[in-house]
Amino acid sequence: MAKREHQDQTGDSRPSKKSKGTKDTKKNTEVSPPYFQSPALDNVPQTEIDKFLSDHSIKITDASADKPSLRPIISFSFLPPSNKDLYAPLDGFASPTAIQSATWPLLFAGRDVIGIAETGSGKTLAFGLPCLKKVLDLKTKQKSCRPLAVVISPTRELAMQIYDQLVKFAEKVDIQVACIFGGVKKDEQREALKSAAVVVATPGRLKDLQNDGSLDLGRVKYLVLDEADRMLDKGFEQDIKDIISPMPVSKRQTVMFTATWPPIVRNLASTFMTSPVTVTIGGDPSADPRANSRIKQVVEVVKPHEKEQRLVQILNRHQRGTPDKVLAFCLYKKEAMRVERLLRTKGFKVAGIHGDLSQQERFRSLEAFKSGAATVLVATDVAARGLDIPHVKLVVNVTFPLTVEDYVHRIGRTGRAGADGHAITLFTETDKAQSGALINVLKAANQEVPEALLKFGSTVKKKQHDAYGAFFKDVEPGKAATKIVFDD
């Protein structure tokens, strides 16, 4: 019975041998071969599939079908056939993550996909492996400065991280990947683009190279918008539209990954995607922000002048013996610089990352922290989204961020890839406007709410806008003004 249900769900994932589509695929190198679901996956009992979806809180919404069309790939052994070397780096992993399991079959089948999941859930491989397989399957000769796949990321650090992960797989099958971002000279990037089939880039630099003729996006068959909500928050909406405009529509597969699902992100998806399947891991993404339940959250209410002394005490406790990696967040660049200097005078191995540092200095700080040369990284929110720094045992919020969403993103640097995490937040009276929202996050994750925090009140104050009031997030942003110059 389970097998029959599966056949109903898979639709055209198993075309007949007489299918003309198969013959056309051989002739047309611009089209990927169809996705064939593993026979071994066919034989998995439906009850086991249902349990997997339930245990991982996976919701799949497909407007073009009544039910999810394909079964999740719950084991690496169920991956579709490809160059065996492409999958070789997976030997270091036990099993796919929830977002990988749910999105892989859809992406391998060529569907447009919206993935909504917390950071640290394995999203890079979720879109990265199908990307590389598609490039292999197309079997087209690479043309200079005309990539087949583009991944757009909001920050340089995240772009570098995506690049590093993709290269581990791409180099096994001789696929060239280029990483493009601002803050460095363009000449080396132009040279890398000549042989790159896959380009990972930030919107600003990608648009620059596109505008000056260094890059032709007319052959792109696979487009990824990673951390889409973050890119829109940073004001890149028009840049993204300009970048996508010359890309082919009919033969392009578009993938969007996001941690939240506000109206502005939904509008972007409706503009550039074709009948997308939405895969949600966890609760309602449009609801209040929720923290990773594996993270132990501790909130300490302190006086503003006590914060730095308390930070030193916390670090002394966590840096004994085998020192833990600790990520300390500050709100402002000057504050981060001051805290970094303080910790260095106290004998801690510390590095910093914030907007005043050059690109090379930021690289060095991240590498020092990743390698263990520095065990404390002091950062502003530039590092709060997307960075996958392994084995961060503790996040300390020296100063509470401007929004509770940023709080959730900050503490998401720990407790990644299934590990447990720990976050300590130093909360002061100046942060009391955020107390209600923070209390809700703590309660939703079954964390202790200190009495001192409750005294600030549990009311959640809605964000206000001068023109739109409390409903500004649901209002379509106005079109940017055009500068008009009149003759004398």
From Swiss-Prot:
It comes from Emericella nidulans (strain FGSC A4 / ATCC 38163 / CBS 112.46 / NRRL 194 / M139) (Aspergillus nidulans). One of its GO terms (molecular function) is ATP hydrolysis activity. GO terms for biological process: rRNA processing. Residues 104-279 form the Helicase ATP-binding domain. One of its GO terms (cellular component) is nucleolus. A motif (DEAD box) lies at residues 226-229. Gene3D superfamilies: P-loop containing nucleotide triphosphate hydrolases (3.40.50.300). It is an enzyme of class 3 (hydrolase). Disulfide bonds: none annotated. Residues 1-29 have a biased composition (Basic and acidic residues). ATP binds at residues 117-124. A motif (Q motif) lies at residues 92-100. The gene is dbp3. The keyword Oxidoreductase does not apply. The Q motif is unique to and characteristic of the DEAD box family of RNA helicases and controls ATP binding and hydrolysis. The keyword RNA-binding applies. Its EC number is 3.6.4.13. Keywords: ATP-binding, Helicase, Hydrolase, Nucleotide-binding, Nucleus, Ribosome biogenesis, RNA-binding, rRNA processing. Belongs to the DEAD box helicase family. DDX5/DBP2 subfamily. ATP-dependent RNA helicase required for 60S ribosomal subunit synthesis. Involved in efficient pre-rRNA processing, predominantly at site A3, which is necessary for the normal formation of 25S and 5.8S rRNAs. PANTHER family: ATP-DEPENDENT RNA HELICASE DBP3. It holds the Pfam family DEAD. This is ATP-dependent RNA helicase dbp3. Residues 306-457 form the Helicase C-terminal domain.
